[in-house]
Amino acid sequence: MDWLMGKSKAKPNGKKPAAEERKAYLEPEHTKARITDFQFKELVVLPREIDLNEWLASNTTTFFHHINLQYSTISEFCTGETCQTMAVCNTQYYWYDERGKKVKCTAPQYVDFVMSSVQKLVTDEDVFPTKYGREFPSSFESLVRKICRHLFHVLAHIYWAHFKETLALELHGHLNTLYVHFILFAREFNLLDPKETAIMDDLTEVLCSGAGGVHSGGSGDGAGSGGPGAQNHVKER
């Protein structure tokens, strides 16, 4: 995944984009942007003689670093004032602390919670072992699914709230390429609930068609962390 990041060429004006109902990221001239035409469907398949958990660990760690890097390019525009909630379309995400308590937070706070918690996990030898002979915990796959769900939220927020800045920085090709690779990998190993990703099905359909046959999932309330259902047309997760 060395293809991910290049230097930015321009500085956006820092203003929060107009309501993204127009979904600029779906416009053909933007969805065509890629930094490689590699067939990621082939890249995500588990290689022969490679342990499944090793493959999941390696790719999950890499996706974490690259999504963190992608977010860092627009982080100065994602503030407590511009993004008072962690929102994507009509869905508002809440963080759940170690005691399972729901925490309402701004988007930058949510992303910080995500990146800090994932960083702690991927550097924990008991969870992501790197030394020969160390075994993965029995709960490893469920932990990977949790990580992927949170990383998906970050990617979705970048598209929904900060695509204008990403476009101004000429990094939308990087974002699209990262999204395709991440989604195809997650679908290959059933790491994301279709209900969780349904909010971005329109983008997934456009970007991944012909790249691995990604199927759209139905919509649903209370997916992911077990948040309550829709209220006033705003879903909480």
Swiss-Prot record:
Gene from which this protein is expressed: MOB2
Keyword annotations of the record: Cytoplasm, Metal-binding, Nucleus, Phosphoprotein, Zinc
Coiled-coil features, chain-numbered ranges: none
GO annotation terms (biological process): signal transduction
Amino acid composition bias (Gly residues), ranges on this chain: 217-229
Location of this chain's protein in the cell: Nucleus; Cytoplasm, Perinuclear region
Record function comment: Stimulates the autophosphorylation and kinase activity of STK38 and STK38L.
PANTHER family hit by this protein: MPS ONE BINDER KINASE ACTIVATOR-LIKE MOB
CC annotations in GO: cytoplasm; cytosol; nucleolus; nucleoplasm; nucleus; perinuclear region of cytoplasm
Organism for this UniProt entry: Homo sapiens (Human)
Free-text description of this protein's post-translational modifications in UniProt: Phosphorylated.
Region (Disordered): 1-21, 217-237
A GO molecular function held by the record: protein kinase activator activity
Family per record: Belongs to the MOB1/phocein family.
Assembly notes: Binds STK38 and STK38L.
Main localisation: nucleus
Binding positions for Zn(2+) per the UniProt entry: 78, 83, 157, 162
Pfam families: Mob1_phocein
Protein name, per record: MOB kinase activator 2
Lineage: Eukaryota, Metazoa, Chordata, Craniata, Vertebrata
